[in-house]
Amino acid sequence: MSASYSASWRRGNPRLLLLLVCTIWSTTGLLVQAKVHYHKWDISYKFKSPDCFKKLAVTINGQTPGPTINAQQGDTIVVRVKNSLLTENVAIHWHGIRQIGTPWFDGTEGVTQCPIVAGDTFVYRFVVDRPGTYLYHAHYGMQRSAGLYGLIRVAVPDGVVEPFAYDYDRSIILNDWWHNSTYEQATGLASIPFVWVGEPQSLLINGRGKFNCSLAGPTAVCNATNPECSPYVLTVVPGKTYRLRIASITSLSALNFEIEGHNMTVVEADGHYVKPFVIKNLNIYSGETYSVLFTADRDPSRNYWLAMNVISRKPGTPTGTAVLNYYPNHPRKSPPTSPPVGPPWDDAAYRFNQSHAIRSHPDYVHPPPLTSDRMIILLNTQNRVDGYTRWSLNNVSFNMPHTPYLIALKENLRHVFDQRPAPETYDYRNYDIHSVPENHNATTGTSIYRLDFNSTVDVILQNANMIEANKSETHPWHLHGHDFWVLGYGSGKFDPEVHPKEYNLVDPIMKNTVPLHYYGWTAIRFRADNPGAWAFHCHIESHFFMGMGIVFEEGVDRVGELPTSIMGCGDSKSLRGP
């Protein structure tokens, strides 16, 4: 037995981990010699100038973005996290990693673990069971927007051939960036009167952007020549084909990405192979990852722009740029053109069409069950709760209990959260999604959705008008612990008697994050086959902070003994022992 298997055997559920290893073996046809990858991270605040404006950022070993985790399918990742933030807790979510057999290491504070308190050390240990492109990021308060994030790249096992060819593999991570601290942002969101976070000051590519220092206040430190904010440079060799992994970790912005003058072929989405299609611009929403192929086949005497622009909300942020450097041109040689500005930000049809185009690769289709056992319809609305502005689902705004759900469920702490069922639907026959709600008021709740283990569940996300007239927002929804089939998108109101007949049950893509377009609906289907408690929420940082999320429970009785390291908060203090 290899070191990774024996170590995983000690920390996780032996039967599930053995099943996972056997599954990897059977699906690849190869004996996977898994490895253990050890990482030692120190989480601390450092002064950083990613867009030339100096501010405090949450860093990993002094850097933001954090280090990229590279592994092969079946490997074990061990991350020793020391919280050196002094006055803040922390938790890290491994976005897109299903945590089969290790639900306690999902890294979701309040759902699967207590936070890592200041000065403490916590060890995450999990298997990366599928190849693809994934993320990690803070999952405590609004720390993600402060810089705690990075990439996870999982390669196929040696000898396995992917359904596309390329010469080199590169990665970029896209982000939006504010100069106000997360404390200032969170305080405004939780205040009366409500203070919105506003549009980001900059867009970052691999942690680099450019703020106009002439706009900085008199007490600000902003240096346009700081090397920390020099543009990221992607160097290419003429004639070669590149796989570019693109991940979005934005806290607010939906983005449109393009490589000036080059076509891109989409081949992967959230770790699943896509039926290839060619685009000039890629729409990418927070929490999504894609792989695209492009060939360096343009005029080699010049450099080109990598550019991203805000879509789906009126932009207040300049174009984010990096440089595509054709070797042997100097990497700092500026392109002779202006950066592309992308398609119109409010072209909803364009965004719908690209969402519809993402389908499973013909050789890698995993057909969904033809029917579901349960349908949950979630109306997304903005509301007031005791005068505070909140986001709600079926008129309930989510509140996180002090004791994590996984611990409460496993240890039968029934008083920790509301045991009444969460609302399954709303009055879809009479509710007008295009109008301001007649009643702005909602309630807060801690109820969860209890799913029969191994059942098939449909979730319909329904968008609607906000409190402000003629306004609806795009929401990227992320499901922890699972991939789901994307059965369809539509504009207007979902009708459960009509629209299921239009589902794509032939070749739907599987993803872990999906957009809900404004005044529209998105239908997903998943199997409740991963024992644990799993968050499902809008990936816009401020929206989840304001209550836009739910929790699914499935098969908790099948979860192994919980490690005491995840305990220590709320009613779990007594379970941890001396």
Where are these regions (language model features)?
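Membrane-interfacial loop-to-helix junctions in multi-pass inner-membrane proteins
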Residues: 9-13, 66, 161-169, 231
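Extracytoplasmic/periplasmic copper-protein system
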Residues: 30-33, 147-174, 319-352, 503, ...
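Histidine- and aromatic-enriched segments that form or immediately flank copper-ligand environments
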Residues: 37-163, 253-282, 303-318, 386-527, ...
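Cleavable N-terminal signal peptides of Sec/SRP-targeted secreted and luminal proteins
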Residues: 11-31
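N-terminal secretory signal peptides that target proteins for export/translocation
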Residues: 1-9
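A eukaryote-biased signal for short, well-structured alpha-helical docking elements
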Residues: 24, 29-49, 181-187, 191-200, ...
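Internal, well-ordered domain-core segments that constitute the primary functional module
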Residues: 131-133, 141-198
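Histidine- and aromatic-rich segments of cupredoxin/plastocyanin-like copper-binding domains
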Residues: 101-117, 173-174, 178-179, 189-373, ...
